[in-house]
Amino acid sequence: MEKDLTKGNPLGLILRFAIPMFIGNCFQQLYNMVDTVIVGRFVGDRALAAVGSVGTIFFLVVGASNGMAIGFTILTSQRFGAGDADGTRRSVANGILLSACTALVMSLISLSLMRPLLAAMHTPAEILGDAYAYISVICGGLACTLFYNLMASLLRAVGNSRVPLYFLIFSSCLNVGLDLTFILCFHLGTRGAALATVLSQGVSALLCIIYIYGKVPVLRPEASMFRPDPAFSREQLRSALPMALIYAITASGTIIMQSAVNLFGAVAVAGYTAASKIHMLLTQGYFSLGQAMSAYAGQNFGGGDFARIRKGVGAAVLILAAYTVLSFTLSNTLLPVLLPFFFDPGTDLSLFSGWAETYIRINTAFYIFLGTIFVFRSVIQGVGRAGTALAVGFAELTGRIFMARASMRAGSYRMAASADGAAWLCGALTALFLYFLVMRGLEKGAGEKKGDQSAWQDPDRDRN
């Protein structure tokens, strides 16, 4: 069911819209975590380190494709908010064509550059083969990931966050079954874990397509619309490319951070990998809130209601503050509970726990800044200023590179673990500044336009 985010109480609307996405994103992280857990327990701690060592590349490739998919649907959200059904359907058709081209190009480029990149990241020799086997399958199956993200984003653009959740839950369960089948029955190791992820996301994409064509007519383009539209392409790429670049910029910094962690050896990489999976689970609330704010801002921008956007931001800040307290509390209980699941029962956890605890404890202190980035950057993107939001990514990159390089010089894992926090602090300050700058410019422009229209409609006003 489509949801109009231009009417009703912003706090309640954003919460009801974000919660299904939060559950879905948690499931997505859980089935990524299941890959890691099954690999660690049934293949070994070296295989666990191998999967973890390419986590930043996974984020780069999959994150960039996700950014493209979300960017393609910002125009859909705006057209839907403006009540333009024909424009909504045309944006869907053009987004599908652009996504197909994106998947092909990104798969070819990533596969051709993978081995040199792994070498440049100082990937330990004993895990290099397993690392390449895993990430090459992920990159080769990028079309499945991109089209799932596109279809789910299209549904969210019209206010439907529940259906993608249902399909994702099914896909998560399928992923677990395929993981066990490929690893235990066919002995495919890390390659099998990646194959399970790709196939599961492909099933989710297919289910979303079937649902859209059967139940959501506003997103169902006519066959004649599947022709490249230069005007729509320019508008969609103007949003999508900066969003993909934001992921790429962020991932570039995390690749440098991963390179710093790799210098401490396979044991440190395994401990860091387990901690980073728990961290990703804890931070899904921020990511989901950002997704909700992008759709909320997009619809209200399409409707021309800037005051309502500001009210929504105020509501999002309240949600952000409450979730930060919750995630900080959970971090102290989840780590000792979940850490043993990543390793074989006979493994001496004391070898890995110190590395994991250091990363989690440092980063939870900076979660408030991470949440700030997601809220304010998403609003900037939702109002069609994705290019401006690139500055947030560059600020994060600067903070992350500075701290990662400092850790390499000092030989300090604690400094390497602080690189994310430094990035979030820099990014949050930049996002806040840009939000106020963008909103002031939009409101000023809207006021001037309204004044011009009033003058045109009242030619006798100067006589009085």
What residue spans do the PLM features occupy?
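Small-residue-rich hydrophobic transmembrane alpha-helices
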Residues: L48-L108, T145-P164, G271-L335, L370-V392, ...
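N-terminal transmembrane alpha-helices
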Residues: L5-V43, T56-G71, L75, A100-S107, ...
